[in-house]
């Protein structure tokens, strides 16, 4: 009888916002590949449904899977290990497997820290997990499976990496039917897709190159629009987010994708994330015609010296120009910003805050605190300098300072971030613009402004 697999998305620490919608893609692809090969698969998504550890334990006791597979970010790492320990209590003979960006670069430590963990899957997991299932079903050893780290004769063994999947079109669409979509869509009625993997850039704060390789592997436009059309026809979906790190990396492919959407007369709205230097006004016009309503981008900093230190490869001038196009075309904007990168000072941080106000986005995607995630060049640099102050991964939420430099303390950075949000949302121009849009926009702007006003007053009182 084929092995039964339960895939688990562990909960985020209390008070943290989970990225369950993105995680659905990772686990969804794994589940789809296993289902295609006739394995029984089910899912426990703790973040999507706010499931407790006790509920996970009860579900695993009831389901009794042969294999329990978890995904893990840095933020959910401790939760994932706790679930593995729970799993072995109620399913003592199950095989426990974990994958994801964090454990890819923390594989040996994960096995050391959790005796109940059997196997770490590094990097892309679809073909690796499938081979593990095939070996288990055939009663064969896992010893020669590429892309895993495991124990052998009491020692931790790291097998060679598995080659990346070259033809992403060969992957089935994520098995979204395994999720309670009716409940999820009450929270957020957006369907997420990814159209590429890998990256050719080497930003210091990002692990994409080490995780997925230093080149872009892209799905063909027809395959992507096939998925859009399937979701539209099957679930009545009309709102989509493309989760690629750089959606417009290949302009001709993006144009072809837009043309395919229009050719099929799909009445949909979508947004995407991309790099500032991978946009032209002509491309944005085409994207809008095909249903694009907003673009989020990694602005990161308004100080050129910090952008250069990040190895971001963009200029402040490029950002100003592109945001001008976006505003002119009526496309909503949401820049992601990083504060506290090594080399940051109070002066450069405030330069970024005033720069964000200058480009006048509709929303601030995030004022992220620079966080040294394992696997990133920044993590290596911070460790080399001895600047790391927080080792509890539950705090790696990009809202909490993790390290400090001689130029900026953790306390100073936390205060600057709080002031940045207050500064942005208390601007009269922002409030007036939201009121001009009318309806819920005006009410939301008022509520947001009042929240930040109260926080700003509280912050000032604390300093007295």
Outline where the language-model segments fall.
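Radical SAM [4Fe-4S] cluster-binding motif and immediate context
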Residues: 169, 173-341, 346, 351-354
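Glycine-rich beta-alpha loop elements in corrinoid/cobalamin-binding modules
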Residues: 4, 20, 33-167, 368-375
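Proline-aspartate-enriched helix->loop->beta-strand connector
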Residues: 64-68, 237, 361-362
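Flexible glycine/acidic-rich beta-alpha junction loops that bind and position SAM and/or redox cofactors
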Residues: 14-16, 107, 201, 251-252, ...
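Glycine- and acidic-residue-enriched helix-capping/strand-helix junction motifs
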Residues: 14-27
């Amino acid at each position: 009888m084929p092995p039964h697999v339960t895939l688990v998305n562990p909960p985020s620490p209390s008070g943290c916002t989970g990225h369950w919608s993105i995680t659905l893609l990772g686990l969804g692809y794994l589940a789809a590949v296993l289902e295609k090969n006739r394995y029984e698969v089910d899912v426990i998504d703790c973040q999507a449904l706010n499931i407790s550890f006790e509920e996970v334990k009860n579900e695993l006791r009831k389901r009794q899977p042969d294999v329990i597979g978890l995904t893990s970010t840095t933020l959910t790492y401790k939760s994932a290990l706790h679930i593995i320990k729970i799993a072995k209590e109620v399913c003592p003979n199950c095989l426990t497997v974990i994958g994801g960006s964090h454990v890819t670069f923390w594989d040996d430590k994960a096995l050391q820290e959790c005796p109940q963990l059997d196997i770490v899957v590094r990097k892309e997991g679809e073909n690796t997990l499938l081979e593990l299932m095939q070996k288990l079903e055939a009663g064969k050893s896992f010893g020669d499976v590429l892309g895993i780290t495991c124990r052998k004769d009491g020692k931790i063994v790291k097998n060679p990496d598995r080659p990346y999947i070259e033809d992403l079109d060969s992957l089935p669409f994520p098995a979204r039917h395994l999720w309670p979509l009716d409940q999820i869509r009450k929270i957020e009625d957006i369907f997420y897709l990814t159209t590429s993997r890998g990256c050719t850039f080497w930003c210091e704060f990002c692990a994409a190159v080490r995780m997925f390789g230093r080149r872009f592997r892209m799905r063909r436009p027809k395959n992507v629009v096939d998925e859009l059309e399937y979701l539209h026809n099957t679930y009545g979906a009309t709102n989509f987010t493309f989760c690629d790190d750089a959606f417009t990396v290949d302009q001709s492919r993006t144009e072809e994708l837009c043309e395919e959407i229009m050719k099929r007369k799909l009445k949909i709205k979508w947004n995407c994330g991309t790099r500032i230097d991978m946009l032209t006004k002509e491309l944005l016009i085409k994207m809008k015609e095909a249903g694009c309503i907003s673009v989020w981008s990694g602005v990161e900093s308004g100080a050129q010296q910090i952008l250069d230190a990040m190895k971001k490869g963009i200029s402040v001038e490029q950002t100003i120009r592109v945001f001008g196009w976006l505003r002119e075309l009526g496309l909503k904007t949401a820049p992601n910003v990083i504060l506290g990168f090594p080399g940051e000072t109070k002066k450069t941080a405030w330069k970024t805050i005033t720069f964000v106000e200058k480009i006048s986005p509709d929303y601030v995607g995030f004022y992220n605190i620079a966080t040294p995630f394992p696997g990133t060049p920044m993590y290596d640099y911070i460790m080399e300098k001895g600047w790391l102050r927080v080792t509890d991964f539950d705090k790696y939420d990009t809202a909490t300072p993790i390290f400090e430099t001689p130029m900026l303390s953790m306390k100073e950075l936390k205060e600057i971030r709080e002031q940045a949000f207050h500064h942005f949302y208390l601007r009269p121009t922002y409030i007036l613009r939201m009121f001009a849009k009318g309806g819920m926009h005006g009410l939301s702007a008022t509520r947001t402004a009042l929240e930040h006003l109260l926080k700003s007053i509280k912050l000032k009182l604390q300093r007295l």
